[in-house]
Amino acid sequence: MKHSNKYLKGHTVIRKAVYTLLCVLILSSCEKYVDIKKSSNQALIETANDCQLLLDNYGVMNTGYPSDGEASADDYYLTDDGYLSTSLTQTDRDRYTWAPSGIRPGAAQWVSPYKTVYYANLVLETVEELKSKGSADVTVLNNLRGSALFFRSLCFWQIAQLYAKPYSATSAEQDPGIPLRLSSDINDKSERGTVAQTYTRIVQDLQEAVSLLQPTSTVPTRPNKAAAYAMLARAYLSMEDYAQAQASADASLQLNSQLIDYNTLDVNSYTPFFPRFNKEVLFHSLMEQHPALNPNDIAKINLDLVNTYSANDLRRSIFLKPNSGDNTGSYRFTGNYEPATSALFFNGLAVDEMYLIRAEGYARAGNATAAMGDLNTLLRTRWKTGTYVDMTAVDGTDALNKVVAERRKELLMRGLRWTDLRRLNKDSRFARTLSRSAQGTTYTLPPNDVRYTLLIPQEVINNSQISQNPR
């Protein structure tokens, strides 16, 4: 994405103005920072253009989303050499083996999304001031507010997938949630609240964002209405509210339903989705690089999963490349919607995910025909031309089994598998015990284990005194 020199200079000024406070975000209840007032930042954030510059900070708003969930999931494995690689810390190894005491001493995967929340809150407060003064175009301000609400809800959702229990309608009012930072004032004390409060805020923010955002955006690093509906669909899916997930996915697809014909891609490329921002991308974001997920010489795709791709399924050759030498017989992941060969994985929102969410909603409602219609629409673009035979299903249960299987194959390394495991484990039809081996020892993770909720980083606990997750 190219920007003018004026943009870059303006962006640098704004970034420097807020940087000094970001390191203390959410790490403490801020007693030692009581002399720093939020106005020290807001004095330099005065116009709608300033707000847009903040939201366009790609390094804060679109990157660094948590990757510990994907690293804890079951779509890959490590050889003993990979497990012992010097690029992995002991904490990374603990995450891989689901060690009960595995806790990050540092807080990067907590602070990074809360940094984005901080930016979003600054924008929300500035927009309200501009509205009260009547000093800016209302349409512009509404879009800025919608964008900030989108980013805040996205971050709350991402944090909740790691550090709050999976949503359950029967216990959400009691289960500890995450701190909901709704102000840029760092003096506000962090409190966890409940899972119900967490998801209520996520849904409220997204519903308002949908009403404010424009249908399209100039670049996919900026939110739009289709992306907000898509994020709402993802949130409802994680809440097991399948009717609302289906409706939200449908609303997103009404605005953008473009799919890539994989027959047009170079199956031999290690970056087949070049250039960046392909037409399926509704909103572009990236996970923080995780050493255990490095596809170059560490992470190998689960062979049971590899074998589910048919010979004429182009995803087998586009998403997977055979390794050589000592790693012959294993496969690396090359299906990243971010055209990079590192572990800088795309975890944004895309059209294919919306087809799968809508299909799952149809299947769970017993509408096998509609579910297979969506699944076939997607898969026709994934198979070699002339080889795909439309799937059929005898009933909703049969359709659901097919949709769930294809969801895992299609959304490989998108940062969604951990959330899917947390959700699907509550259904005995899909519950599974995960198993991994390292240095001759086998490690397991049963369905619904408390370890599906990660321990909050020690640095956060030390500084904020919020309650830790149980073990």
Give the residues covered by each predicted segment.
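Sec-dependent bacterial lipoprotein signal peptides
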Residues: 1-28
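Membrane-proximal, proline-rich intrinsically disordered regions
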Residues: 2, 30-78, 305, 389, ...
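Short, surface-exposed recognition loops and adjoining beta-strand edges that mediate ligand/DNA contacts
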Residues: 41-45, 70-85, 165-174, 215-292, ...
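Extended ligand-binding clefts on enzyme/binding-domain cores
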Residues: 44, 239-240, 246-351, 398-418, ...
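Conserved, well-structured interaction surfaces
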Residues: 90-163, 193, 208-215, 342-351, ...
